[in-house]
Amino acid sequence: MARALMFQGTGSDVGKSLLVAGLARAFTLRGLKVRPFKPQNMSNNAAVTADGGEIGRAQALQARAARVPLSVHMNPVLLKPQGETGAQVVVQGRVHGTAKAAAYQGMKPSLLPFVLDSFDRLKAEADLVLVEGAGSASEVNLRTGDIANMGFARAADVPVVVIGDIDRGGVIASLVGTKAVIDAADAALIKGFVVNRFRGDPSLFATGMELIARQTGWAALGLVPHFSEAIRLPAEDALALSAPPAPKPRARTRICVPILPHVSNFDDLDPLDAEPSVEVRRIRPHETLPVDTDLVLLIGSKATIADLAALKAEGLHHDILAFARRGGHVMGLCGGYQMLGETIADPDGIEGEAKIARGLGLLKVHTVLSPEKRLVEVAGVALDPAVAAPFSGYEMHMGVTAGADAEQPFAVLSDGRQDGARSASGRVSGTYVHGLFASDAFRSGLLGALGGAPSQAAYEQGVEETLDRLAAHLAAHLDLDLLFSLAR
């Protein structure tokens, strides 16, 4: 029977996802069959499974670290915020409906059986299941009906390790405070704590570790130094967008990406960020398009019509249209592709009130949103002669796009379908495929077409090497044998 160990945090973004990914690789390298599991995740950064479901992108990275295929059971409840209608609720990989916050609280007890079913399925095929909590373990106001943290741990009888982030300050208060506010039955499941992202001389925090252990009664399981290479791994959620990569003054290619309120699948940017000669600039509200832009890239959105309205409200559409008139290159991915067209119709009110929105008009295509969601892994070849390279990726969208420019498609897919559209000039293009920038040949061809340096990077190989180094980093600062002994 498989063992399981759960990692909860004192708050969001304390490093739970990365720690689970690193431990998944470390225990896998020891010969164990490892499966990652997160009962409930909230993110618009999702990955497609082979059977046409979807899970959080963090669990996809953890599965990769464990060297196993993605499964919808690794993240049985995925919440995808989508504007005025609340959040789309995805259960075991399939859309279950939409709910606003208050309604979802009432829905949670009915979702626990799905969560436990998925957990049991993973345990049946693994030696060790590494469970990640969500947000903070100490949100006692949300404890009733909880399925993400202690509610799940109690229901599944899984021991817990609590993670605190010293980099943001107040880690002693965060950990001791967590013990103070949770009830005794929940606290009984906690076996120890880890202090994450430490910088400096570890001996200077020895008394801090002792104080936390004394105040909580939990075992001090490790002080993990900051892992600077984390930026080489795909980001989990939109918090990463608040800390964009450092400027690259010597970059040969500058790609500008408007950051809109309901941005999704922003991990499409990671392979571009990893290019030494490419600077990906995030364009925030009230900012204008820089004059040295080589490509405007509109990425995915969970509320396309609302984000299109936000783009226009900021006046950034004027910059984009002027840039295109001057011969600039513009590319749209999924929701960004839909925005580039002439109209987006939502007759069924998928994104709220039924309406028709006028797009940017840079592509002669029209989109009709529909309730059916397309989730599929794809491969294909870009048809732009300047790029003409193979790629792989995935589709994740609700809607159909057609029109004159779709007769000059962006790509032909391996199943024979045509995807996307290109303008008559070839300088404006759109595609429904996410993840294509991770394909080295395609990325290199695109950068060359923009007049930049063709890529010499091997992105996927770099992710694998970084996971190996993360595993070694954790193995050097955590007792893996002790952690395994705590699992049950």
Curated annotation (Swiss-Prot):
The family annotation for this protein states: Belongs to the CobB/CobQ family. CobQ subfamily.
Pfam families xref list: CbiA, GATase_3
CDD domains attached here?
GATase1_CobQ (cd01750)
Which GO-annotated molecular functions does the record name?
ABC-type vitamin B12 transporter activity; catalytic activity
InterPro entries in the cross-refs = Class_I_gatase-like (IPR029062), CobQ/CobB/MinD/ParA_Nub-bd_dom (IPR002586), CobQ_GATase1 (IPR033949), CobQ_synth (IPR004459), GATase_3 (IPR011698), P-loop_NTPase (IPR027417)
Organism domain of life: Bacteria
Q: Name the species this protein comes from.
A: Xanthobacter autotrophicus (strain ATCC BAA-1158 / Py2)
Q: Specify the protein name.
A: Cobyric acid synthase
Question: Which positions are tagged coiled coil?
Answer: none
* Biological role stated in the UniProt entry: Catalyzes amidations at positions B, D, E, and G on adenosylcobyrinic A,C-diamide. NH(2) groups are provided by glutamine, and one molecule of ATP is hydrogenolyzed for each amidation.
Keyword terms of this UniProt record: Cobalamin biosynthesis, Glutamine amidotransferase
Record GO biological process = cobalamin biosynthetic process
The record places domain GATase cobBQ-type at: 252-442
Q: What does the record give as the active site?
A: 334 (nucleophile), 434
Q: In which pathway does it act?
A: Cofactor biosynthesis; adenosylcobalamin biosynthesis
